[in-house]
Amino acid sequence: MFMNLLTQVSNAIFPQVEAAQKMSNRAVAVLRGETVTGTIWITQKSENDQAVIEGEIKGLTPGLHGFHVHQYGDSTNGCISAGPHFNPFGKTHGGPKSEIRHVGDLGNVEAGADGVAKIKLTDTLVTLYGPNTVVGRSMVVHAGQDDLGEGVGDKAEESKKTGNAGARAACGVIALAAPQ
C-alpha cells in the first residue's frame, strides 16, 4: 500500500518538476545552521552544459569544510534529515575530480580567517535537468574537511561513504530560482 501511495505521489510530482525545470536554468539553496549561513546558486545553461556552483557561506571556522549535495530536501530533524550524499549511480565517495564519486561530492570549500568561504566551481555530474536533478535535494556544508575518499586505517571505511567531513554545519533545500 505504501509503495502504491509513493508511486502515485511520484507520478503527480515529477511531471510538474520536469515542467518547471524547462522554465528555469537556475536553482538556489539558502543554508542555515546554528552559526553558519549562506546562499548557493547553481546555474546550468542547458542539459548538456556543466553546472556552475557559486555563492558565499559565513560563520565557518577557518579552513576546509566538506561541501556536498545530499539525497533529501528534508530538514525536519535539522540537517541530519538530508540523508546521505546524493548517489544515484551507487558509487563510493570521492573528490570532485575523481572518476569514482557520488554525484553530490563537491569536495571542500575554504573559509578564510573571517569565517567566510566564497565559492565558484563547475561540475559535470551535478544537473538541474532530468531524473538525476539536484533540485529538491539539500546542499550541506560540514564542520570538518572532506578527505575525498582517501582516508586510511580506521578512517578508510567511513571515508568511502562520507569523506569523514564531520558534523553538518548548515544545510538548505535546493529550489528552482527565476531563470537568468
From Swiss-Prot:
Q: What is its main location?
A: cytoplasm
E.C. designation(s) = 1.15.1.1
Which Gene Ontology molecular-function terms are recorded?
Answer: copper ion binding; protein homodimerization activity; superoxide dismutase activity
Family, per entry: Belongs to the Cu-Zn superoxide dismutase family.
Signal sequence segment: 1-19
Catalytic reactions on record:
2 superoxide + 2 H(+) = H2O2 + O2
| UniProt activity-regulation remark | The insertion of copper which activates the protein requires glutathione. This is independent of copper chaperone for SOD1 (CCS), which activates orthologs.
Q: What's the protein called, per UniProt?
A: Superoxide dismutase [Cu-Zn]
Q: Which gene encodes it?
A: sod-1
Q: Which PROSITE patterns match?
A: SOD_CU_ZN_1, SOD_CU_ZN_2
Q: Where in the cell is it found?
A: Cytoplasm
What note does UniProt attach to the cofactor annotation? Binds 1 copper ion per subunit.
Q: How does it assemble?
A: Homodimer.
Consequence when changing residue 167 to P:
Abolishes enzyme activation but has no effect on disulfide bond formation or dimer formation
Which residues are noted in the entry as Cu cation-binding?
Answer: 68, 70, 85, 142
Q: Which CDD domains match?
A: Cu-Zn_Superoxide_Dismutase
